[in-house]
Amino acid sequence: MNILLLGGAGSLINQMILKLRKEGHRVFVLTGDRYKKQNYEKVFETYNFPYNSEDLSEIIESVNPDVTLFMGAFDTNYRWDKEEREMVRYTSDLMNILVAHTKIKKDKFILLSSDEVYQGNYEDEIGEDVRPSGTKIRAKTLIQAEEICDNFRNNWGMDILIL
């Protein structure tokens, strides 16, 4: 399978690359940054483009992924030191990525979120029907990202999974 990973360099994405390659998948990486030359494990092809690049659709069509995994909450391209700025950048990048994916209907899109969206105390086990309740800006941004994905799943018929 062709797997497209979207995210900045780090131990998590590198471990995913190793695992996917070991399972025999062809792994591609879109770094999300045009200028930084980051260190990734060996992949079939690395694309150094920002998520808001006009070439994003062409890259995705060229890779023709069976699965696209956006590192999301674990993407090292987002620093979150200036939360309001990162909130806008994160949600607009996700929108650009999803819009670019509307052209190819065959792949599964996976967004990595975080348990940070469930802040607070819960008496019962948290199931799929429990609404997220994050209070901090980063948590609210991740909740908004999940809702954007739900919108694309429902209105565009995309195969989207949020983990």
Regions found by a protein language model. Give the residues of each.
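Active-site Tyr-X1-5-Lys
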Residues: 120-122, 135-161
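Conserved glycine-rich Rossmann-like NAD(P)H-binding loop of the short-chain dehydrogenase/reductase
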Residues: 25-34
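Conserved Rossmann-fold NAD(P)-dependent oxidoreductase catalytic core, especially the SDR/UDP-sugar
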Residues: 68-70, 95-137
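Short loop/helix-cap segments at secondary-structure boundaries that form the rim of catalytic
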Residues: 34-43
